[in-house]
Amino acid sequence: MSYRGLTILGCSSQQPTRHRNHGAYLLRWNGEGLLFDPGEGTQRQFIYANIAPTVVSRIFISHFHGDHCLGLGSMLMRLNLDRVLHPIHCYYPASGKKYFDRLRYSTIYHETIKVIEHPIDREGIVEDFGNFRIESRQLDHLVDTLGWRITEPDTTKFIPEKIKAAGLKGPIMQELINKGQVKVNDTIVHLDDVSYTRKGDSIAVVADSLPCQAIVDLARNARILLCESTYLEEHSHLAKSHYHMTAKQAAEQAKRAEVQQLILTHFSARYNTTEEFVQEAGEIFPNVFAAEEFCSYEFPKNPS
């Protein structure tokens, strides 16, 4: 089974600190590497994390404030240098096309890879293919900003005792999957009679935003919500004026969305530690963590 985990490559907001780099988040899942909001220095963070940049297959830019995209150009250059053979899909708000181009072509280099751009100008399903369904929602920030939801397909799980009792085996099993029913010894057996559906996991990624219904809709029942929490509640006036959230507000969104796990990130440089973020959010949503650089949050597939 391929690795399933979210690795924090950076978790600072506008300014990096001695202990926190600009934000960047790598989701390795179903044989792909999804990189979210690569800030300045992301390429170097891969080295410290002991992860090859070549695992990246898709890059998501929530918006074009520098701390969410300054690492895009250097990451694309690195992937060119490594001559990756797979295409690199890039998703970003369509209104930021000129900034994407500026970052991509900001220096002279030899382009060897195939970059497939997905400028997003609508909410809803962006792509739906074998490994994932990608959805976007418009968040409430100062500029066009997208939140993301990545969902794997549902899978059909057979119940061995019922398969045996129905006398199913061999090629007829594939027929049952394809047609939804088969005839065995003059009896019609439906797929639902001998199986159940395991819902695919979802992960929601919410960058800069005020609290809004879009976050709740995006994160509904997600396995993990990675959510900005730039400030503590004592600085809620700053959160409001800069269109960000506090740890408490992020926890409220997670509770409303009924997610399984909340990971806070995008911390203001004014805070030296993140313990208070966990304490503040934990009063509302207990299963909460503060992102730490190079920490990985694994989510193995539920066998049931």
Curated annotation (Swiss-Prot):
Record's signal peptide: none
Binding-site positions, Zn(2+) 2: 67-68, 208, 266
EC numbers for this chain: 3.1.26.11
Free-text comment on the cofactor: Binds 2 Zn(2+) ions.
Cofactor: Zn(2+)
Catalytic activity: Endonucleolytic cleavage of RNA, removing extra 3' nucleotides from tRNA precursor, generating 3' termini of tRNAs. A 3'-hydroxy group is left at the tRNA terminus and a 5'-phosphoryl group is left at the trailer molecule
CDD domains in the cross-refs: RNaseZ_ZiPD-like_MBL-fold (cd07717)
Residues annotated as catalytic: 67 (proton acceptor)
UniProt xrefs under HAMAP family: RNase_Z_BN
Protein name, entry field: Ribonuclease Z
Recorded name of the encoding gene: rnz
